[in-house]
């Protein structure tokens, strides 16, 4: 039986990072997302600069203001977060259909079928993080292991912008020394019960019998018993049927030079063709999307009689669509090429290994 390989990707301070990307003046500042300092809401996300003051998620905004009076308080922009999340999930699905999103900014990926001797799971995780950085200008942390529990644990161990691998060689040492509050799923209430019963770290948990843990925590006790031993048989659950494949790029500065933009369209067409070939699919619609310097999103789609899958065919259609969309007086900050209405190709295509 092939050993499973699971990646857990967790975006770093996602909401705050999106705000800092879209407003460079916020970069390096203590950014607190959730609302005005005077509001009755709670903190959604705080940048690492704000966390140094003790600000954290779910904290009342009023308390965050007391701790960090010079912080930059930003109202949540869920439209931008959802749009960026969709980009990130699309990147995940360009590698595998076995993707289980847990929220806008984190997901599990089962990449067991992609791993081979010269392409370990850690390298695939690096490629995914690189794609996220190039396409969204955001950093992500990754955990790699042989089950979901350990992959999630690993993703939080080297933040921000880091990666940790937990394997059979290091799992015991990591779990035994882990603070009980750092076990995924152990909240404040559970932590108090743990402490009241002499459980302060993974070793203490490991030394409890399954019966003792069930007595303390009910059905959850069996799960805690398994976690102390690094056991988790849960599957990566994905019910999504792929409907489209695409790639977007945000320019470092706003651009209105056709030659530069079309070079990017060619690059995106190639990336999209690679992903189609990996899936052994072809497409009957092509869409080009642009976002102007004023953050206005425009798109145009063409439906085709015959399906396409090659870089040249996708580019030729994208070229026509871009020319219909463009306004020479309006610089753009983002361009994307997406193909949809997918169908199975009638010939053997290349695989991911031809493109990595």
Swiss-Prot record:
Query: What catalytic reaction does the record list?
Result: DNA(n) + a 2'-deoxyribonucleoside 5'-triphosphate = DNA(n+1) + diphosphate
Protein name as catalogued:
DNA polymerase IV
The record ties this protein, via PANTHER family, to:
DNA POLYMERASE KAPPA (PTHR11076:SF33), DNA REPAIR POLYMERASE UMUC / TRANSFERASE FAMILY MEMBER (PTHR11076)
Per its Swiss-Prot or TrEMBL entry, what cofactor is needed? Mg(2+)
Chain's role: Poorly processive, error-prone DNA polymerase involved in untargeted mutagenesis. Copies undamaged DNA at stalled replication forks, which arise in vivo from mismatched or misaligned primer ends. These misaligned primers can be extended by PolIV. Exhibits no 3'-5' exonuclease (proofreading) activity. May be involved in translesional synthesis, in conjunction with the beta clamp from PolIII.
**UmuC domain sequence ranges:** 6-187
The lineage's top-level taxon is Bacteria
What are the GO MF terms of this UniProt record?
Answer: damaged DNA binding; DNA-directed DNA polymerase activity; magnesium ion binding
**CC annotations in GO:** cytosol
Q: Does the keyword Iron apply?
A: no
Point out the annotated site residues (description: Substrate discrimination): 15
Q: Which UniProt keywords apply?
A: Cytoplasm, DNA damage, DNA repair, DNA replication, DNA-binding, DNA-directed DNA polymerase, Magnesium, Metal-binding, Mutator protein, Nucleotidyltransferase, Transferase
The note on the cofactor says: Binds 2 magnesium ions per subunit.
The active site lies at 106
Q: Does the keyword Nucleotide-binding apply?
A: no
Q: How does it assemble?
A: Monomer.
Please report which protein family the annotation says this sequence is part of. Answer: Belongs to the DNA polymerase type-Y family.
Q: Which CDD domains match?
A: PolY_Pol_IV_kappa
Recorded hits in Gene3D superfamilies, A to Z, give: 3.30.70.270, 3.40.1170.60, 5' to 3' exonuclease, C-terminal subdomain (1.10.150.20), DNA polymerase, Y-family, little finger domain (3.30.1490.100)
Q: Where in the cell is it found?
A: Cytoplasm
Binding, Mg(2+): 10, 105
Biological process terms from the Gene Ontology for this record are: DNA-templated DNA replication; error-prone translesion synthesis; SOS response
Identify the EC number(s): 2.7.7.7
């Amino acid at each position: 039986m092939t050993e499973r390989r699971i990646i857990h990707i967790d975006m770093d301070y996602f909401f705050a990072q999106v705000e800092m990307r879209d407003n460079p003046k916020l970069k390096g500042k203590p950014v607190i997302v959730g609302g005005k300092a005077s509001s009755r809401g709670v903190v959604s996300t705080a940048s690492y600069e704000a966390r140094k003051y003790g600000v954290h998620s779910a904290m009342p905004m009023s308390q965050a203001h007391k701790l960090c009076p010079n912080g930059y308080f930003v109202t949540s922009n869920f439209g931008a977060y959802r749009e960026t999340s969709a980009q990130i999930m699309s990147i995940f699905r360009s590698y595998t259909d076995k993707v289980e999103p847990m929220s806008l900014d984190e997901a599990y990926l089962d990449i067991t079928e992609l791993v081979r001797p010269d392409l370990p799971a850690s390298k695939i995780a690096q490629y995914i993080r690189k794609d996220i950085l190039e396409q969204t200008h955001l950093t992500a942390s990754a955990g790699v292991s042989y089950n979901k529990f350990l992959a999630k644990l690993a993703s939080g161990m080297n933040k921000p912008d880091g990666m940790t691998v937990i394997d059979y060689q290091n799992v015991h040492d990591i779990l035994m020394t882990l603070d009980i509050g750092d076990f995924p799923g152990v909240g404040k209430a559970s932590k108090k019960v743990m402490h009241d019963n002499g459980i302060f770290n993974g070793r203490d948990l490991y030394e409890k019998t399954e019966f003792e843990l069930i007595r303390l925590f009910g059905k959850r006790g069996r799960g805690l018993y398994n976690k102390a031993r690094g056991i988790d048989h849960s599957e990566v659950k994905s019910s999504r049927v792929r409907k489209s494949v695409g790639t977007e790029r945000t320019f470092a500065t706003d651009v209105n030079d056709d030659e530069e933009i079309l070079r990017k369209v060619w690059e995106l067409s190639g990336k999209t063709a690679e992903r189609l070939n990996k899936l052994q699919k072809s497409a009957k619609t092509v869409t080009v999307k642009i976002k102007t310097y004023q953050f206005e999103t425009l798109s145009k789609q063409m439906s085709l009689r015959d399906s396409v899958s090659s870089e040249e065919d996708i580019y030729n259609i994208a070229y026509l669509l871009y020319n219909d969309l463009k306004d020479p007086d309006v610089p753009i900050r983002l361009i994307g090429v997406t193909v949809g209405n997918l169908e199975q190709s009638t010939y053997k295509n290349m695989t991911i290994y031809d493109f990595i």
